[in-house]
Amino acid sequence: MAKITHFKGYSGPVTPSSIPKPSTPVDPIILTVQDGVPVVYPGCHALGVRVVHPANPKAPAKNMGLVMFYLPPHTINPPGSHETEETYVILEGSGTMTFANGRTTQVQKGMFVYLPPWCEHGIENTGTDNLVVLIATSPPNP
C-alpha cells in the first residue's frame, strides 16, 4: 500500500468556480441501479446502466458519469478510445483488458484501471460469471 497522506483541504490554483454556491443547502440524490437508464454499446452484447449521467433525469450530473456495466461470460466490448477520462472499478468477476498495440492485462474484483483521454481500451469477460464494472467518466460520455 502507498504511504498514507493527510488531507489538508483543497489545494491548487485558485480559480473562480463555474458553479455558484446556492444560498440554501443542496440535497443529495440517493439512487439504486434500478433508477438508472439502460444503454447498449455498438458491437457488444453487454448492458450498461447510466446511474449518474446527463441522460438520467433522476440524477442528471453535468460533470461526471457513473455507469454500471454488466458483461456476460465470454463477451467482448471491443477496443475504442474517447476524449473523456475514465476509471474502471472491477466489482465482480474477472477478464482481460486490451490496450493499444495489443497490450493486455488481467483484471479481477478489487482492481481499478485509470484510462486517460484517448487511451485505447477494450474488455473481455474471460470468466464463468458476469463481469461487473463501475465506470466513472469525466466529463460524461454522450
What function would you assign to each model-found segment?
Residues 48-55, 65-82, 117:
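Conserved short histidine dyad/triad with adjacent acidic residue
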Residues 77-79, 97-98, 115, 121-128:
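Short beta-strand His + acidic residue motifs that chelate non-heme Fe in jelly-roll/DSBH
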Residues 1-63:
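A short, N-terminal "cap"/entry segment at the start of jelly-roll beta-barrel domains
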Residues 66-69, 87, 114, 128-142:
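A short hydrophobic beta-strand segment most commonly corresponding to one strand
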Residues 101-117:
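Short acidic-glycine-tyrosine-enriched beta hairpin
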Residues 68-72, 81-97, 136:
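Short, conserved beta-strand element in jelly-roll/cupin
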Residues 75, 83-84, 103, 119-120, ...:
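A generic "binding-loop/recognition-motif" signal
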